[in-house]
Amino acid sequence: MRQLLCLLAIALAPSAVFAQPARPDWNEPFPAHQIIDNVYFVGTVLLGSFLITTPAGHVLINSDFESTVPVIRESVESLGFKFEDIAIILGSHAHGDHMQADALVKELTGARVMAMAEDVPALRRMRPGDKEHPIDRILEDGEQIMLGGTTLTAHL
């Protein structure tokens, strides 16, 4: 019986990762602020989202949950940037609380979604609102992303 319960818990765990936030404070705003140079915090009290600004558009790291997008948008705009200028969406790792809203942010901004090759299988199973999770570019360890004079290096 114990073994069956453990297997059941393991089998159901991924669905919890892709679900909407169970905690209302996950969407509680936190003051947007500059971290250093062109890197800004635009997340919530419990969810870390970051904006890297460039003259050619911006990079959003962690779109979080779909219900969090209005908070992120407000944070971006409170810093004087346009949400629509997001050109690239990245995620720290393939969990719903970091990348579930990629499709929505892409729809709102036209941004390209990029993900590590190792995250692709989990992202393909992530279907918020029964939408396919977009992946425009698959990144390998050490690969570089360049935008507006800023270079990011993907690391696993």
Task: State what each model feature region is.
Residues 41, 51, 144-146, 153:
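Residue-level detector of beta-strand face positions
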Residues 67-70, 77-147:
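Active-site HxH/HxHxD metal-binding segment of metal-dependent hydrolases
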Residues 17-21:
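Boundary at the C-terminal end of the N-terminal hydrophobic targeting segment
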Residues 140-141, 150, 154-156:
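Ligand/cofactor pocket segment of small-molecule handling proteins
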